[in-house]
Each structure stands twice: as C-alpha cells, then as structure tokens.
C-alpha cells in the first residue's frame, strides 16, 4: 500500500468513526497534541482534551437535522518523507435533505510506522458549493 493510499484510508476512517459515534476510534487517528480549525468555532483547538470539550459544546438539538452521510472526494495528497499534506472536498448530507460542501486541509506525520493527523482545517465552502 502506498503512503497516499494509507493516509486516504485514515482520512475516510475518521469520517466513518464520526458517523458511528466512535470518538475513541477517531482520536486514535489523531496525534495527542493535534491542532484543529473547526468550521463551527473561531478559536484554534489544541490537543485531544480541548477537542473533547469542543465536541461537548456542539448543540445537541434532537429536532435539528443530523448528518446522514459524509462523502470525502477529490483528494490531493503530497508526501515528503514522514510528513504529508492532504486536501479534499467533503460533501455533508443532512437528514433534512440539505447538503454542505466543506473544503478540508490536513497535515499528517508518520511516527513509529503509523500516520496520524497533526492538524486539520475545515472550511464550509461559500459561493454555492461545488463549481
């Protein structure tokens, strides 16, 4: 398996874990001191503890549309030794039939033979979504 294939599989595993509610599985793919620019918050999240806090702050309105599908596509992956840069588009489908298009950039590092995300930046695309 190429590094690019392995990294892309891990990116997709994060989304699968999100849909399954498996935060431990997601966190296992993140470096302990990961940094995250979340689309819903302005501040930079630093580390798994603050990430867990961010998750708890997310609204839990049972009447709000829920995420039903995450379609990661169009990956552009560059690898330089033990560092990789991943850019992709994420289509988020909600239970009310609406969609959001998210642009995502993440940085990955290989440590002890495993690729872990060290930074993630997501941005809800404006201007009508996909061109």
Residue positions per predicted region:
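Residue-level preference for beta-strand/loop junctions
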Residues: 69, 82, 86, 100-102
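Short beta-strand edge/turn micro-motifs at domain boundaries
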Residues: 101-131
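Short, well-ordered beta-strand segments in beta-rich or mixed alpha/beta enzyme
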Residues: 35-39, 84-92
